[in-house]
Every structure is written in C-alpha cells, then in structure tokens.
C-alpha cells in the first residue's frame, strides 16, 4: 500500500512540476515598418523648381507613421524621383496595411504636376507592401490627394 501511495505521489508531483515549468510559446511579434519610399514618375506636366511636395503614410487611424516634407526641385517630364520617408515610431504591419498615402503640393505659382507613383513599405520580417497609383495630378487649385493602401 505504501508503494502505491508513493507512486501516486510521484505521478502527481511530476504532473504539477511539469505544468509549473511548462511555458507557452511566445506569440509571434507582428512585423514593424522599417523603411518607406515613394517613387514618382512625372508624365506630361513637370513639377516646378520652387514647388514643394509633402508625402505622408498614415495608419488605419489616420496617424502619420512615415513622412517626407518639403521635397523641392524641378521634376521634368518623363523623369523619375525617389523620396525616402522617415519612419515615426514602430508601426505594425496590420495598421499600415489598412492605411493611406497623402500627398500635398505647395506651389509658389501656377503649377500642374502630372505623375504616377509607387509606395514601397518594408517590414522587419523582410516583407513588403507595394502600391502603385497612375494618372495622378496635383495643381495650385487642387493641391492634395489621399490614396488607400488597401
């Protein structure tokens, strides 16, 4: 009888000990945004020298998560310019994927700029979100646009 009780005690002790030391696997961290860039292909109307461009990537709540402001210089017809955005904080991929891109033009005089553009977002797990937008334009009368990343 003593042997049976000792055996049961050992089994119970083993069960409680293994449960106490067992650890659940840590949940996988959601990837975070590590870099962002926007590539602009000017089409039929150039961007003037003094005209500045602001680029913002926003999360699903509309908060800025990457930006580049005051991009100036003449962007001629049929030219390509790449703008690197500064990432703010540690935005997660899920929030970014449902976000948007906002562009604002600050012309010093009359200006119409026609372009296509592509936004590339790189994450900590080496995945990318790339979205392209075609037949875009901004003018002194219509200086802003917002495009969805969905």
What do these predicted ranges mean?
Residues 1-8:
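Bacterial N-terminal signal peptides that target proteins for export
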Residues 17-19:
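N-terminal signal peptide c-region/cleavage motif recognized by signal peptidases
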